[in-house]
Each structure stands twice: as structure tokens, then as C-alpha cells.
Amino acid sequence: MTTILRTTNLTKKYGSKTALDNLTLELQKGEVLGVLGPNGSGKTTFLKIIAGMHKKTSGEITICGEEPGIKTKGMVSYLPDRNFLYKWMKISDARDFYRDFFPDFNEQSFVKMMEVMNLDINQKISSLSKGMQEKLNVALCFSREAKLYVLDEPIGGVDPLARDMILDSIIDRAYDKKTIIITTQLVRDIENIFDRCVFLSDGRAILSGNAEEIRNERGMSIEETFKELYRGQI
């Protein structure tokens, strides 16, 4: 197996607040990792460190054997938890931005994703609903030939139709053996594609491992485990 992501005692502090606390895990090529927890548990901080947007405080993290930096930004396709495109853009401008900025951008994949998501290349970003914006962001993310896809709450707060389209796209990539990290609180919708899970609380991993082994050991689904671990917090 090829290790795509490895962390050892990964820690991130903001002043006196510890957002990520001694996180240790590995993700192999072709695996899907679910990063689960309530708001403020450290999920987004973890993803931003992987994406090279935040620097670790201590510990180790490597992506394909490299520490996060300019080189790994070319390996990681990151979908943040909020829209990152300028309102004045058309979808075609967003495509051009990705094509110019990312050498691994695959325009044929983007055209197919646009058809799947039922989006028009001439639409303005400012005219898109939240669900349509998220579909576009997912289309751009998956149009890169990246080593690792990192998705922060890709189905949160969107309408059911958009959620289904986004889920189908994620599931298709999982079946294609793409390496994916997903944060979500909508566990039921997506847990079947998880190979591994890590449950975070106050930045610490309170449960981590193979998803099927967690189900078998606890005698319940990943969603039920989520509800049990975070009862009173969600």
C-alpha cells in the first residue's frame, strides 16, 4: 500500500487554545477517511493544515512523503466549507482560474461534471443558489487529477437535490479509488463509503480506525456511534 497521508502527534495551537491535539493517523491510497465531530472539534483546522493554509505547532505531517508546502499544494485538491469564488465571476471565469492555476486541471472532467451538476458555463456566481455554488465548487475540486481530495462539509446546508448530486459525485470518486478526506455531520448520508473514521472532540481523537471494525466492535452504525459519542453536543 502507498501511504498518502501520515500524521504523528500533530498539534495546532492558537495562542492558549489547542485546536488539534496530538493527532496520529495514516491514510492509504484509494481510502476514504471520514473526519467526524461537532462544531469546534478541530475538523476544519486539520483540513487546513493538510491544504497548507495553516502551519502546525508541533508533531509531524506528510503528504506523499512531503511536508505541507508549495509542492503538496499541487497534490491536494481542497474544498473549503464556504464559497471561495468571486461574485463577479462567471462559471467560465472560475474554470479559467483553475485551469491557469492548477496544472492537473482536467477540462474534459470539468465538462462532464458540469453536465452531471446541471450547470451552465455562462452563469454568474452571484446568480447561483447555495446548492448550485456548492455543486460548482465540487465540480472544480474533482476536475483536478490530485493525489488527495479534501472536502470540508461538502453537503452541509444545501437543498436535497443538490445534496444528492454532490453525494453521487463523491461516491463515484470513491468507487474510482480516489483518496478522499471528508468532514461532515450528516453521517448517515455518506458513511457507507468510509474506509476509515476519526472522531474528534476538542482537537483530540477519541475514536479512530477502520470503519467496518468500528461497526463490528460497537455493534452499531457509524452514525449511531457519532450520536452516542457526541450526545448533548449536537
Which ranges hold each PLM region?
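Helix-to-loop junction immediately C-terminal to a conserved catalytic motif
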Residues: 51
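ABC ATPase "signature
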Residues: 208-209
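Catalytic Walker B motif of ABC-type/P-loop ATPase nucleotide-binding domains
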Residues: 149-153, 158
